[in-house]
């Protein structure tokens, strides 16, 4: 354990967080973190269950005097988003996250930190380990594959949980208590293409759009962050219009729920157009820096010589650039009921060349079911217009707020007493597992809260250390106040 983490308070929560960072846990590859949690539960002689889908449930009896309180589910997810800077050598399947303290923040060296949702796991483990904290019966539920499919929540059985209160430990703004979330649906678009051999006289170059912040496509979509796929495509579209361009490859974005922060293309031009292309790239770098001078201070665009033997056919290239240009991205509608709350959005998440097809991924979110259908239809119409095949996932439900929640009132009273101010009670424009869990357990009383985490789903992910202490104090105080059965 690094000396920096060793000195953080509360020690037990940070101890477990450090251990978690040493265990590889990509989405859909939770074997190692699952074993770690099972070994932990068995070490403390706690009832430990692995369900059919791969979720882990650890039960701890109530402390003396709390046997007549309602059982509480502490819910977090095992997997983490695996993103790294292009110049960082790191294998998420085998390597341990390297953490560092920078001022008031804890972050990682060139990769995502995994505080989403490692800090939730660590808090639950610290409570399961502790012998002095007063609490009702606890069910610590650690779900699998939240980040790429909500698979654990989808596969959760309707008879596993005994608790009637659920505390979701997967929110990212201290002082905010969430009582609702958006539903969502992902989209896979496939566009066929053929290849053509390049003439020996052609010039080939790689164009990079990078240095963007990226971030969570739900929680940060309203910040006006740039989308690397959209920026790169603007260059390609304009170059083809001005002097003609060929495309050998396009690689932008990786995750459905992350705003793309890097995109790369290998392009082909006639020798006489080489300088025109370089000038255009330089021009667009200035344009982008001006357009995003407040939100993307590290943005850069560069061009360098590259090698390629083929390009895609010109018709497919035109279809691709036209459809990417017109594809909606960002906030589509704001809530008419909640001030400054995004109702509907979409994220142009990734563009890849794979197996002779161009694979484009988008992710739509909305707190209104009809609006979610509408934005999905917009994406479908856009790509159908160029002959692409479009397939939507089944999606996941939203979580309808319950302003009369008993645990919400407990949480409000606790926050006021601890911190001498009111918490903000909100809904979030992101998919929380509460929506799916609430479908299976309709009587479950749920809230979500957590410490302040910035830059989630990007290598800039960081956790504000003091708020983690506040999160811990808040969590254990809520447990002490749990309502009677």
Label each PLM-derived region with a short phrase:
Residues 158, 224-242, 271-274, 318-325, ...:
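His/Asp/Glu-rich mid-to-C-terminal helical/loop segments that flank catalytic regions of hydrolases
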Residues 136-228, 240:
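Fold-level recognition of mixed alpha/beta catalytic cores in primary-metabolism enzymes, strongest
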Residues 220, 227-250, 401-444:
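Active-site-adjacent substrate-binding region
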Residues 5, 13-14, 336, 343-345, ...:
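Zn-dependent metallopeptidase/amidohydrolase metal-coordination segment
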Residues 18-22, 265-266, 300-311, 349, ...:
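A short beta-alpha structural unit
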Residues 180, 197-202, 221-251, 271-345, ...:
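Acidic-enriched catalytic cores of C-N bond-cleaving enzymes acting on peptides and small amides
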Residues 3-105:
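Acidic/His- and Gly-rich active-site-bordering loop/insert found
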